[in-house]
């Protein structure tokens, strides 16, 4: 079975081919440079970029593999959550391909795909506990199969990735700033009391990072010397050493606070779900070194394996959509051409059609 995956939920255009569960090839076009001047993603521009790039990537992908669209058995596409216009670009493109070549159409939950992406590199054991940490979502799932996810905890306001983005922006770090927050923080010294660990004094598994965002903003406002004068990293020797170290220490403390928050909630979830066979951590923030280190320790504490996708599978990509589509199609699931795009904030229904 050859499955084409299409990812267009935000500002990455990704296409990939998975054959019988193995990644054959992939293409990814990033829009980082396009949106950097605005300091964030502009939905209209992102949609137009998807429209422009999708056919180009498909031609390149098929040509390099010496394939045609008639060789494709399944077209899987991210149906949500995401930016409505961006999702519609991918969905319309997928439907056009299905009409052209007669392949099956499978709509993929973008969030679930992040968590099952590690299956491209190793066998997944179920049931598993899944932690999804991204720009828009911080969720904990009980995963009983690739098609059965139970949401145990979710972000109530701002996700962890949003806190990273706003922290970077408050310091005038270049967009996207998540990696710089990690890299600079690794050079600093942690002050565990600098920022409050948010929303842990309760008995639930939900997250709230709005308070941490506010605490960071207040700290930067009180210490305006932390901000770079312009959006960018200054040349070597421009900064005063003390200011540079203070910034690194602040970011080290911020990284610690996010990691500690995730640690508390995941440990609580594992105590309530003792039967899980592994801990899966995915999403863009899963590339953060502190998050990876903390989750390694948590998994060891509960004597279960930690499943972390490779760095390139943590961020949005076509491979995770292709693999999730392959899993669904292998289980006999598909969608009709009336498949809808589901933007962020709405529940994605399990409305697939099962055959056999």
Curated annotation (Swiss-Prot):
UniProt keyword annotation of Lipoprotein present: no
GO molecular function: iron ion binding; N(6)-L-threonylcarbamoyladenine synthase activity
Cellular compartments per GO CC: cytoplasm
Cofactor(s) this protein requires: Fe(2+)
UniProt-annotated binding residues for substrate: 132-136, 165, 178, 182, 288
Broad enzyme group: transferase
Cofactor notes: Binds 1 Fe(2+) ion per subunit.
Keyword Transcription in annotation: no
EC assignment: 2.3.1.234
A UniProt-annotated Pfam family: TsaD
UniProt catalytic activity: L-threonylcarbamoyladenylate + adenosine(37) in tRNA = N(6)-L-threonylcarbamoyladenosine(37) in tRNA + AMP + H(+)
Protein location: Cytoplasm
Record key words, sorted: Acyltransferase, Cytoplasm, Iron, Metal-binding, Transferase, tRNA processing
Record-linked SUPFAM superfamilies: Actin-like ATPase domain
Binding site for Fe cation: 110, 114, 316
Protein's GO biological process: tRNA threonylcarbamoyladenosine modification
InterPro entries: ATPase_NBD, Gcp-like_dom, KAE1/TsaD, TsaD
HAMAP family: TsaD
Family indicated by similarity: Belongs to the KAE1 / TsaD family.
Main function: Required for the formation of a threonylcarbamoyl group on adenosine at position 37 (t(6)A37) in tRNAs that read codons beginning with adenine. Is involved in the transfer of the threonylcarbamoyl moiety of threonylcarbamoyl-AMP (TC-AMP) to the N6 group of A37, together with TsaE and TsaB. TsaD likely plays a direct catalytic role in this reaction.
Designated name of the protein: tRNA N6-adenosine threonylcarbamoyltransferase
Origin species: Maridesulfovibrio salexigens (strain ATCC 14822 / DSM 2638 / NCIMB 8403 / VKM B-1763)
Gene transcribed to yield this protein: tsaD
């Amino acid at each position: 079975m050859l499955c084409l995956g299409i990812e267009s939920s935000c500002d990455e255009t990704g296409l990939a081919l998975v054959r019988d569960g193995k990644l054959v090839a992939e293409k990814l076009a990033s829009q980082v440079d396009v949106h950097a001047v605005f300091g964030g993603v502009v939905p209209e521009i992102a949609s137009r970029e998807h429209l422009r790039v999708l056919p180009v990537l498909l031609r390149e992908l098929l040509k390099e593999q010496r394939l045609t669209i008639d060789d494709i058995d399944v077209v899987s596409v991210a149906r949500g959550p995401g930016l409505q216009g961006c999702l519609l670009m991918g969905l319309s493109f997928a439907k056009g391909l299905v009409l052209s070549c007669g392949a099956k159409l499978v709509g993929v939950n973008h969030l679930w795909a992040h968590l099952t992406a590690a299956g491209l590199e190793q066998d997944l054991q179920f049931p598993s506990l899944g932690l999804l940490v991204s720009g828009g979502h911080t969720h904990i799932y009980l995963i009983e199969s690739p098609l059965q996810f139970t949401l145990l905890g979710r972000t109530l306001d701002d996700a962890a990735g949003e806190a990273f983005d706003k922290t970077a922006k408050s310091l005038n770090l270049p967009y996207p700033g998540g990696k710089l927050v990690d890299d600079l923080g690794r050079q600093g010294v942690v002050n565990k009391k600098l920022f409050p660990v948010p929303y842990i004094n309760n008995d639930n598994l939900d997250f709230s990072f709005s308070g941490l965002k506010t605490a960071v903003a207040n700290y930067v406002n009180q210490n305006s010397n932390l901000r770079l004068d312009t959006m960018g990293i200054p040349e070597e020797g421009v900064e005063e050493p003390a200011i540079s170290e203070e910034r690194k220490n602040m970011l080290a403390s911020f990284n610690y606070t996010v990691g500690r928050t995730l640690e508390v909630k995941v440990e609580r979830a594992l105590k309530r779900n003792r039967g899980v066979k592994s801990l899966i951590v995915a999403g863009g923030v899963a590339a953060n070194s502190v998050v990876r280190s903390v989750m390694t320790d948590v998994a060891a504490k509960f004597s279960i394996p930690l499943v972390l996708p490779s760095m390139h599978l943590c961020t949005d990509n076509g491979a995770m959509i292709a693999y999730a589509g392959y899993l669904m199609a292998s289980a006999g699931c598909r969608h009709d051409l009336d498949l809808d795009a589901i933007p962020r904030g709405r529940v994605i229904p399990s409305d697939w059609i099962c055959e056999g």
